[in-house]
UniProtKB/Swiss-Prot annotation:
Full protein name: TPR-containing protein DDB_G0280363
Bias (Basic residues) ranges: 598-625
Amino acid composition bias (Low complexity), ranges on this chain: 25-44, 52-85, 153-194, 307-316, 466-477, 576-597, 626-687
Region Disordered: start-end pairs: 19-85, 153-195, 296-334, 447-477, 576-687, 706-728
Ranges for the TPR repeats: 769-802, 899-932, 978-1011, 1046-1079, 1084-1111, 1112-1150, 1152-1184
SMART domains documented for this protein: HAT (SM00386), TPR (SM00028)
Species this protein is from: Dictyostelium discoideum (Social amoeba)
Biased composition (Polar residues): 296-306, 448-465
Biological process terms in GO annotation: mRNA splicing, via spliceosome
Source organism phylogeny: Eukaryota, Amoebozoa, Evosea, Eumycetozoa, Dictyostelia
Keywords, alphabetical: Repeat, TPR repeat
Length: 1304
């Protein structure tokens, strides 16, 4: 090398070094800022808490560092000659015995014995840093950056001289890797030195958990990835630990010397022409920006790598512009480029030859290797237009290979694939020849495959398009032939053919992976023009393809229309032929009619002879029908086969897999019966269509069969059933009408009727029956019976197949006491809707009300031929009918039959259990409940029934009951679990186990939803009140008031007022009820409680006043009228009768009012009237228990103490009453059955009732001041006339709360 060349080379290198140094400083400042942001975010997530103090200290030190940059630049040369000792900042863990400092990393290896002696010092509460150490840190960073810059300069020059210009991107990456691996080499060569790391991120990464680590000094050993050196410096997983021995200055000098030696060795290797193996990680230093911290990659790595690439590209451009070569290896690179160009030319020639061969094979195998739809399958996504125009521009436009066949193309596919340029040329050749396919998605064996759309150029003529249309028609014909053949193939054969075609075409069409070169980034203007022309051609080709697709769709539609017309003509011809045959058969049967009195054998022979004669006389006619049927069957089979093949090919494997489990599910019993019924009807019609032989008999059954077979007109019922379906538009119109009609109702009946009649002209006919139904209801509420009947008749005439009209009409007649007319209406409705469950149940109950059990059983007998799965609800009503009639054995058989055939319906087991419980057969009831729980373990009511039964049969031993609670908790859903614990708490309360009851309430609170917690607090308050813990009960009521919804607040206020009354605070109770009158004005129970409060306090005048004020607001509350009747007994019988008559005008169906009328009749010794009134009371309100007790008293007065009350017990069992003052007085326990309460009432009546004669003798006028009856009769004076304060606590609670049991 000459002196001038060496001088120019050294001068250029100095200039480049200065520029690189300037750029590197700017980059370092940016990188440091970004690193600081990253460390702040990372440490906030890692440590949290008091990290802001550390961050402020770092910012302050950074400002000092920027001020000292100029001074440091001047001292760089001195630092290179005499480097200072740089020490990485560390966390200091001060041990009491020995000074052990851990730089950063994992603390899992510290011994447990050392934990107590380790003090973690981290800035304030978190960590601590020395300012001197931070200054050393900044100096250390600058020192290593300068070394890296020098290393970059040398390596860039050498690598640019050695490598080709086409591989600039690789060289940039190699330089980065060289620099990255240099540090690793330095660190690996020095076994006894500590790793001095840049601790911007790592200095705060300290694991919070400390596990066993043993330390030793003076020997090299590894324990759990812990290395200990001879110089006293140990490392844990690559992290240095200083044990206090050794000099850091000497180690740094050694490191610097070793780094300089490595640099010299790398330069010597480059000068010798050796290639650097980038796979070796020990060559160059690994920069901090690309490190991973605790598995998290640094965010600055991408920024630094981009900046380095830009700098290296600028250097290379400058080096290219220099006239003199930098290294003697430049000429060798030119030779290598020439050799590469020659090799590329040879490859292109070989590829052109392969293209010609492939095109010939492609044309020959297009018809063979097409899919079922005639479309080639290619296992890749479609290439974008940019990729077709210039495939070497960007890899983002390249087609993506299919993931389904990734195992086939996973290796080096250079031999199996062709170049992208050849692929583009092949597409152009295909467009010029016109051999293209439409782009479509076709489902192959392994998934969706794309077939490319290679369209002809814009220069194609109309003749060419016509030829293409003809080719497509030919292909369709070939497809039809192929599909007919493919039907008879097995699924495996079809799969094999599809996969073979796919594998063949994928090797031809699939492009290889694209390798980008740097020359492709620079495009000539000529190439750009070519790209624009190609894009324009592609757009025109797309438009042309759309036009062709539209033409093909129009042709397909025309063909389908022609096929439909032909099918219709064939069907018409068949119908005409059938009609002619039927007419001929009828004429011949009329001739043979006199021979009808012969035996059945002769009649069959005659029919056979007639059929033979008909077949002989018309052989051609029969053959024609058979041929037509055969052709129809063949066409139908072909269509079905084509559809099956298309669906199998178009559906993806995932969809087929999702459909397979649905097909494998067994059909339900209802579906099986429907399938059998449809199969039978289809078989009958197919046989008649194929044979055209109708065996005609003159019986009525055969005539009905002929009407169904000959497709005669449907009966009028069927024509009107089609009108039941209402469109969404008609429903929306009806909703709009109802809103306006409700507003017109308030103005009056006439205005509403006028509006309704006007709306009939606008509304559709399908909705007219609903309008008439609303008008009938309005007339009924206005007590216009005649008008209501007219409208109901209009409803039943327009839509007789809707049960709602019949039910409303029958209910109106029943309300007016016309039971016979109601019966006729229900019978007429069942003729039109014979198997409607609501009509059947209503009819059965009405027949039972009329004491016509035979009529009810006759209605049930109609269901004999019907499926149990459609009529099981009506059958269950029949079982309840027999149970109410006292036929217990028949009812048990019916329920047993239902439990066998409908085991999945829980209410069947519930009704069967109630039947056995009413009969006091508790063991049978338990067996039924357990059987039901086995079939449906998540049905909650059965679990509550089981708890009730086990508590009844426990006799104080609750082990089985508690086991049932645990079973129920595991079986039911979480929404019901809190109710199980609530019931368990009440069970424990009744057995006097308050601790267990409170524990169960606590569990109920834990599992109860927030909107229902008030019920648990209310139940707990009632429990504490029964235990006379009034303070705790009051607190729980307050808690319930806080959480109860506003709509149910009145219930909690009632509980609060009763609690204060029980505690003796009557005035406070009155104030609470007054507040409840304002908040819950619509709740009549609040007003009734005010009346009862005054009655219990013996303030009868105030009670009468409260009752009259309450009736002004709630005139429809029967219990308020009953209380007013009781209070007017003090004023005499006449006043009582006047109130009774007035009450019947407002509440004619109130059982409480009729019961008070019966008491008035009993006091006046009018026993017949009393019995009649009590029957009304039981009929209208069967839940009111006082009616049954008064009826029992009437029976004892008439028939004596030894009277038979079995019918009364059965009546009481069927009604199952649950409230009433006298009823609750006779109830000993909540678990008592209706029969047990009635027996208790009889005992009390016999003990307290005097004989009838004495009763009549002692009846005096002054007894009118009594409540009901004399003192010796069980009457209300036991409840009210006694002083409330003199009662026991149990009697007070019974009088206060009555039947209001808190239920979950």
């Amino acid at each position: 090398m000459n002196n001038e060349d060496s001088l120019s080379y050294s001068f250029g290198r100095m200039m480049l070094n200065q520029q690189q140094h300037h750029h590197q400083q700017q980059n370092n400042t940016q990188v440091q800022q970004q690193q600081q942001q990253h460390t702040t975010q990372f440490n906030q997530v890692r440590f949290g808490g008091n990290y802001h103090q550390q961050h402020q200290q770092q910012q302050h030190h950074q400002q000092q560092h920027h001020q000292q940059q100029q001074q440091q630049q001047q001292q760089q040369q001195q630092q290179q000659q005499h480097p200072q000792q740089y020490i990485s900042p560390t966390f200091s863990y001060v041990h009491n015995n020995s000074n052990t400092s851990i730089t950063h990393g994992n603390l899992y290896d510290i011994d447990d014995n050392q934990i107590d002696n380790v003090n973690i010092i981290r800035g304030g509460n978190r960590g601590y840093y020395n300012q001197q150490q931070q200054q050393h840190q900044h100096q250390q960073q600058q020192y290593y950056h300068e070394q890296q810059q020098q290393h970059f300069n040398i390596n860039n020059n050498n690598n640019n001289s050695n490598n080709n210009n086409n591989n600039n991107n690789n060289n940039n990456n190699n330089n980065n890797n060289n620099n990255n691996n240099n540090n690793n080499n330095n660190n690996n060569n020095n076994n006894n030195s500590s790793l001095i790391t840049n601790s911007h991120h790592a200095q705060r990464i300290v694991s919070p958990i400390v596990n066993g680590m043993t330390s030793s000094s003076g020997s090299n050993m590894m324990i759990n990835d812990v290395s200990f050196g001879m110089n006293g410096i140990s490392s844990i997983n690559g992290i240095s630990i200083n044990n206090g021995s050794g000099d850091i200055d000497e180690e740094d000098d050694k490191l610097l010397d070793e780094q300089q030696q490595l640099l010299q060795r790398s330069l010597e290797r480059l000068s010798d022409g050796e290639e650097i193996s980038f796979g070796n990680p020990n060559y160059f230093f690994h920069p901090f920006s690309e490190r991973n911290i605790n598995g998290l990659p640094s965010t600055n790595s991408s920024i630094v790598s981009r900046q380095q690439q830009l700098q290296q590209q600028q250097q290379k451009l400058k080096l290219k512009s220099s006239p003199s070569p930098i290294s003697p290896f430049f000429y060798t690179q030119q030779q290598q480029q020439q050799q590469q160009q020659q090799q590329q030319q040879q490859q292109q020639q070989q590829q052109q030859q392969q293209q010609q061969q492939q095109q010939q094979q492609q044309q020959q195998q297009q018809q063979q290797n097409t899919s079922i739809n005639g479309i080639i399958k290619i296992d890749q996504t479609p290439p974008t237009p940019q990729y077709i125009a210039n495939p070497s521009v960007s890899p983002l436009n390249a087609p993506i290979s299919s993931p389904v066949l990734g195992d086939i193309y996973s290796g080096n596919n250079n031999n199996n694939n062709i170049n992208t340029n050849n692929y583009r040329q092949q597409q152009k050749l295909n467009t010029s020849t016109g051999s293209y396919q439409n782009m479509s998605f076709d489902a192959g064996v392994n998934g969706f495959n794309w077939s490319p759309s290679l369209q002809p150029d814009q220069s194609t003529s109309t003749n060419h398009t016509q030829a293409m249309l003809q080719q497509q028609q030919q292909r369709q014909q070939q497809q039809q032939q192929q599909t007919q053949n493919l039907v008879y193939l097995n699924n495996q054969q079809i799969k094999s053919t599809v996969t073979s075609n796919r594998d063949h075409w994928s090797s031809v069409v699939k492009p290889p992976p694209i390798q980008l070169q740097q020359n492709s980034m620079q495009q000539n203007p000529i190439q750009q023009q070519q790209q624009q022309q190609q894009q324009q051609q592609q757009q025109s080709l797309l438009q042309h393809q759309q036009m062709l697709q539209m033409q093909m769709q129009i042709q397909q539609q025309q063909q389908q229309q022609q096929q439909q017309q032909q099918q219709q003509q064939q069907q018409q011809n068949q119908q005409q032929n059938q009609q002619q045959n039927q007419q001929q058969n009828q004429q011949q049967n009329q001739q043979h009619y006199p021979n009808q009195h012969h035996g059945q054998h002769q009649h069959n022979q005659h029919n056979q002879h007639h059929n033979q004669h008909h077949n002989q006389s018309h052989p051609n006619h029969k053959n024609q029908h058979q041929k037509q049927n055969q052709t129809q069957q063949s066409t139908q089979q072909q269509q079905q086969q084509q559809q099956n093949v298309q669906t199998s090919t178009t559906q993806s494997p995932l969809l087929q897999q999702s459909q397979q489990p649905q097909q494998q599910q067994p059909p339900t019993s209802n579906q099986r019966q429907q399938q059998q019924h449809n199969n039978n009807t289809n078989n009958v019609t197919t046989i008649n269509n194929q044979t055209n032989i109708n065996i005609i008999n003159n019986d009525s059954d055969n005539e009905e069969l002929l009407t169904t077979v000959n497709h005669s007109k449907p009966p009028p019922n069927e024509s009107k059933r089609g009108e039941l379906v209402e469109s969404p538009v008609s429903k929306q119109q009806y909703k709009h009408f109802i809103k306006q009609f409700k507003l017109k109702e308030k103005e009056g009946l006439e205005i509403a009727m006028e509006f309704a009649f006007q709306s009939l002209s606008v509304l559709p006919e399908k909705v007219h029956w609903r309008v008439y139904l609303e008008l009938a209801d309005l007339a009924n509420r206005q007590n216009n019976l005649k008008l209501a009947r007219k409208f109901y008749r209009k409803v039943t005439s327009t839509q007789p197949y809707i049960s709602q009209g019949w039910l409303e009409y029958a209910k109106m007649e029943e309300d007016y006491g016309r039971l016979e007319k109601c019966q006729k209406i229900l019978q007429l409705g069942l003729k039109h809707c014979p198997f409607n469950e609501s009509l059947l149940i209503k009819g059965i109950r009405h027949e039972e009300k009329m004491d016509n059990l035979e009529g009810a059983r006759a209605l049930l007998s109609q269901l004999r031929d019907q499926s149990i799965y459609k009529t099981w609800r009506a059958v269950m009503e029949g079982g309840l009918l027999e149970a109410r009639a006292g036929n217990i054995d028949v009812a048990r058989k019916i329920f047993k039959y239902l439990m066998k055939h409908v085991p999945w319906y829980g209410p069947i087991y519930q009704e069967a259990y109630k039947l056995e419980e009413r009969c006091e057969e508790y063991e049978r009831a338990i067996n039924i409940v357990e059987k039901g729980l086995f079939e449906d373990p998540k049905y909650g009511p059965l679990w509550f029934s089981a708890l009730r039964l086990y508590e009844k049969t426990s006799h104080g031993f609750l082990q089985s009951t508690r086991n049932t609670v645990e079973r129920a908790r595991q079986a039911v859903s979480r929404e019901v679990t809190w109710k199980i614990y609530f019931e368990a708490a009440q069970i424990e309360e009744r057995s006097k186990n308050l601790t267990l009851s409170r524990a169960a309430y606590v569990k109920s609170v834990e599992l109860c939803p927030e909107n229902l917690l008030w019920k648990v607090w209310l139940g707990g308050s009632r429990t504490e009140l029964n235990a006379d813990n009034i303070c705790i009960a009051r607190k729980l009521v307050f808690r319930a008031l806080e959480e109860v919804p506003s709509k149910l607040r009145s219930l909690v206020l009632l509980e609060y007022s009763r609690l204060e009354e029980y505690a003796g605070n009557i005035n406070k109770s009155r104030r609470i009820l007054k507040m409840a009158h304002v908040e819950a004005r619509l709740d009549w129970k609040v007003f009734l409680e005010s009346v009862l409060l005054e009655m219990r306090a013996n303030n009868y005048e105030a009670a009468i006043k409260e009752a009259k004020e309450s009736l002004k607001i709630h005139s429809g509350a029967g219990r308020l009228w009953a209380a007013l009747i009781q209070l007017n007994q003090l004023k005499g019988v006449k006043s009582q009768l006047n109130v009774f008559k007035k009450a019947l005008q407002f509440v004619p169906k109130s059982g409480e009012v009729w019961c008070e009328g019966a008491r008035i009749a009993l006091n006046n010794n009018e026993l017949r009237e009393a019995r009649r009134f009590l029957e009304f009371a039981i009929q209208f309100t069967p839940q009111f228990g006082d009616s049954f007790i008064e009826l029992l008293r009437l029976e004892i007065m008439e028939k004596g103490p030894n009277c038979d009350i079995s019918k009364l017990e059965q009546l009481c069992i069927n009604a199952d009453p649950n409230y009433g003052f006298m009823w609750l007085h006779c109830t000993v326990c909540v678990l008592d059955s209706s029969r047990q309460v009635l027996r208790n009432a009889k005992k009390l009546l016999l003990e307290m009732t005097q004989p009838k004669e004495q009763y009549l003798e002692e009846k005096k006028p002054e007894y009118g001041s009594c409540w009901v009856g004399s003192d010796g009769v069980l009457s209300l004076n036991r409840v009210f006339r006694n002083d409330f304060n003199n009662m026991s606590n149990q009697e007070k609670r019974k009088a206060l709360f009555g039947s209001d049991v808190v239920k979950p």
